[in-house]
Regions:
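Intrinsically disordered, low-complexity terminal regulatory regions
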Residues: 1-95, 171-173, 183-189
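Short hydrophobic/aromatic beta-strand element in the GNAT-like acyltransferase core
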Residues: 56, 101, 138, 151
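Regulatory sensory and allosteric helical modules in signal-transduction proteins
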Residues: 62-70, 78-134
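Residue-level recognition of short loop/turn positions
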Residues: 107, 144-145
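A short, aliphatic-rich beta-strand micro-motif
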Residues: 135-143
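Sensory beta-strand/linker motifs that couple input domains to effectors
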Residues: 145-156
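Regulatory loop-to-helix N-cap segments in sensory/regulatory domains
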Residues: 155-171
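Hydrophobic recognition helices of helix-based DNA-binding modules
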Residues: 177-181
Length: 190
């Protein structure tokens, strides 16, 4: 497998390079993750959405090819209707240049965007126009080897004052889930 890093737009790299992508892909496959939806991770995302009151919650396990939501909670009806009359539905896969999780993975720390519009770097992201995302809260899933496996995140179509309580909650949930995912290492392969 090869990983093609993103190309810069002028001098600004809008999506950070993911140097750990090949190692992460190998680690996720060893854990039996990242290739299919996981009902337990869907349930985790649902609980996270309930806890935060956000309409979207995800467990994102990106690999060399893009992002994959192994755990996903979305509203039954898309809360945004685009100007063309279509209500977009967030699926399980997104390109690397969509959304904010790739930034969490590259930074290796949580990202709080209370109003995406306040940040020029993020305001032009495709998920803002396509899904109406206006706020984001995400934290990395870091395993015991120090590798970022992915992210735990929530998003809303309204600006949200996540504040310190939101940041603390997302980081705690990410840490708990990382331990749970790592326990798969001792399980036999599928």
């Amino acid at each position: 497998m090869t990983y093609d890093p993103p190309r810069p737009a002028g001098r600004l790299l809008l999506t950070p390079e993911d140097k750990e992508a090949p190692a992460r892909t190998r680690r996720l496959r060893r854990l039996g993750l990242g290739e299919r939806p996981e009902p337990a991770l869907d349930a985790f995302a649902h609980r996270l959405a309930e806890l935060t009151g956000a309409p979207y919650a995800m467990v994102n396990l990106p690999d060399e090819h893009g992002q994959f939501y192994a755990g996903l909670f979305v509203p039954a009806v898309a809360p945004v209707v685009r100007s063309d009359g279509i209500s977009p539905r967030l699926g399980r896969a997104l390109p690397r240049d969509h959304g904010f999780c790739p930034h969490v993975v590259a930074r290796r720390k949580a990202l709080v965007l209370e109003d995406v519009g306040d940040y020029p770097r993020f305001a032009g992201n495709p998920v803002v126009d396509e899904f109406g995302i206006r706020s984001y809260l995400g934290a990395p899933l870091i395993d015991g080897t120090g590798l970022v496996l992915g992210t735990v995140s929530v998003a809303d179509i309204e600006p949200r004052p996540w504040g310190k309580p939101g940041l603390t909650a997302i980081k705690e949930h990410a840490a708990l889930l990382a331990v749970e995912l790592e326990s798969r290492d001792s399980l036999p392969p599928y």
